[in-house]
């Protein structure tokens, strides 16, 4: 629902002023910015994932886009697991190039190649565990060690793992999808 009903223009303006001062404070004036339902969902997911905060997006592609674009700028590089979710590959192989952001893919069973792929421009290692297309499991502990050693941020798509089986934030990942 994108329309939120108010009794008067005065009420809308009050709510909008509060939302500007505190964007996550539960002041709803338009559904795209969140509703009581989305904020409750975010609070529940934050507890399930045992994380600091959760943002919901309308699609998985939106979540991947947000995770990557929040830490990269033109000229940066990311490294992604080869068997990523096909829309993630679409994003990395097509859209990131438009922004001069390079993606290198690594074999999830060859972490030496992953480490050799890291450059001074590498900002993110993007992991899926298990991999969407192949269900490959990776040594995420080793990946985290490599990332920390090189001071590279990490993101993991945990769609298949869910917080029931895996809690990536507790393990040390910087971002969870």
Where are these regions (language model features)?
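Glycine-rich beta-alpha junction loops
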Residues: 2-7
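Short, solvent-exposed polar/charged micro-motifs at secondary-structure junctions
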Residues: 9-12, 114-116
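Conserved N-terminal alpha-helix of the aminotransferase class I/II PLP-enzyme fold
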Residues: 10-62, 89-94
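Conserved PLP-enzyme active-site core in the AAT-like
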Residues: 54-177
């Amino acid at each position: 629902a994108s329309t939120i009903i108010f009794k008067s223009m005065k009420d809308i303006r009050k709510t909008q002023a509060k939302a500007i001062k505190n964007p996550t404070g539960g002041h709803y004036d338009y559904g795209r910015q969140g509703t009581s339902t989305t904020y409750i969902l975010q609070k529940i997911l934050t507890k399930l994932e045992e994380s600091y905060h959760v943002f919901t997006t309308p699609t998985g592609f939106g979540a991947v886009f947000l995770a990557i674009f929040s830490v990269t700028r033109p000229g940066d590089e990311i490294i992604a697991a080869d068997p990523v979710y096909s829309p993630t590959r679409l994003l990395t192989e097509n859209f990131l190039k438009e922004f001069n952001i390079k993606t290198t893919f690594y074999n999830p069973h060859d972490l030496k190649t992953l480490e050799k792929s890291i450059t001074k421009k590498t900002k993110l290692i993007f992991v899926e565990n298990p991999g969407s297309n192949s269900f490959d499991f990776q040594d995420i502990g080793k990946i985290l060690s490599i990332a920390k050693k090189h001071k590279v941020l990490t993101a993991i798509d945990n769609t298949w793992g869910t917080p029931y089986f895996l809690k990536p934030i507790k393990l040390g990942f910087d971002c969870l999808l």
